[in-house]
Amino acid sequence: MAGTSTRSVIRWAAVVAAVIFPVVLIGVGGPPQAVTSVVTFHPAVSDFQFITASETPPTQAQCASVGRRCFNATAMQNSYNLGPLYGHGFDGRGITIGIVDSFGSDTMAHDLRVFNDAFGLPHMCGEEGVTCGSGMPMFSELKQGNVNTTGQPPNNGTGLETHNLWALEVALDVEWAHAIAPGANILLIDTPTAEVLGVQGFPDFFKAEKFVIDNHLADVISQSFASGEEAFNSTQSLLNLRYAFEAARAQGVTMLAASGDSGSAATPKVPVKNPTPFPFPAVWWPASDPLVTGVGGTYLCTDPNTGLAVDSGSPPAQCQTNPGVREVGWIAAGGGFSHVFPRPLFQNVLPAGSTTIPATARGVPDIGYQASSRTGVLVYITNPGYTGIVCPDGSLCSAGWYVVGGTSSGSPQWAALIAIADQINGGPLGFINPALYKIGSDPARYAADFYDVTTGNNGSSAPVPGYPATTGWDPVTGLGTPNAAVFLPDLVQAVHGN
């Protein structure tokens, strides 16, 4: 694996602020044929609530008034025990997190500054109004083709290419990757098309990823987008897009993906809003790919102000009805068993009591994290021209705080965790799935490294039955959620075979 210093020299010589590259430059090494179907491919953020138009974050009382608890950065860091790592200087510095989204956001540099001011996080070189200094983490953008982020693109009547939802996804991904790994660099990778353009939009994502991987621009990549495996015209159409993941494994880049937000079901390739799920259990790709680490989801029932203790008294009901339980499996967390990929070797040995993974199917997800917006993270966004938000005084709002959920909340935060592990390692860890299950196969290590989520289910898509969260691995939260201070150093050891 390439060392951090080598990657850094190449990376920042190539990317300083915002780079625009045409599609033709990244087509080399692409798939042997294009996807030929219209694939419903969308941001995994689907669970959100607008709270306030102020630049000041909302109070817990404001959040509780709409049945939510809203996590700030400190509370989330404490909930997953990151403090001891920060205390030893491990915050992701020297590592770059790649975040892939459609369209990008013209206001991200401004919104990131507001977010960091609100929560006392370190500022990044590349933020609006911030003077760059030695050793500061960098926020930058890599734009594929002509990315137009100011106006709405044509949507062919479907509404699926709306910039507003993607802008919220971008803000969630960037702000919360930084919140968890405040020393890491962040590269936002923008593509000019979205999910309804199956022939163009899908390959654009993976051409962009391949460009980033081949040019050593990121050490870990978060993918907060998904499509049902059956949404492709053929299995071969899906397999033709795996070239970026194969390159990532060869070059030591960790790939993560949200497992989806429709529970144990997935949706067909119909270019309409909110298509009816398939009438059978199904999973979302790329989280179902064995070369990718899939991230499932939970309700997080810790104190949203401090994260230091379980809070069973505040909303939502899932926390109130499970007293003393720190996390409950999220009802909409994507998970189940692949119809494309057989069980990989790394899933042959699971913790005792796990849900059985059949030999014919890869189990999804691998790991879990907070996901429901009922116990969501606070995201600040400016959305010029959006008329869907009404301020308390009745006027139309264009900026403010949301509480946001979805498994796309977990993917960038897990990418941030891996950035910290990369720093501990002295360079990128690369493909981590075998190491995750190596830890899971050792009862003592597993008990120390993971919070095992054993309550809840992902049965949100009736009549498709959901799966329960169980002891060990399950199709809702995978192996569980991370006790970061113990898990990340142990992950480094496991990657090296220890």
Predicted regions: what is each one?
Residues 2-6, 448-449:
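Membrane-interface anchoring segments and C-terminal beta-barrel signals
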Residues 4-34:
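Secretory targeting and sorting signals
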Residues 22-25, 324, 348:
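N-terminal start and proteolytic maturation junction detector
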Residues 32-294, 338-406, 411, 422-431, ...:
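Substrate-binding/charge-relay-adjacent region of secreted/lumenal peptidase catalytic domains
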Residues 294-340:
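Polar, glycine-rich mid-to-C-terminal structural blocks
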Residues 354, 422-475:
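An often Trp-containing, charged/polar helix-loop segment at the C-terminal end
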Residues 417:
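Walker A/P-loop NTP-binding active-site region of P-loop NTPases
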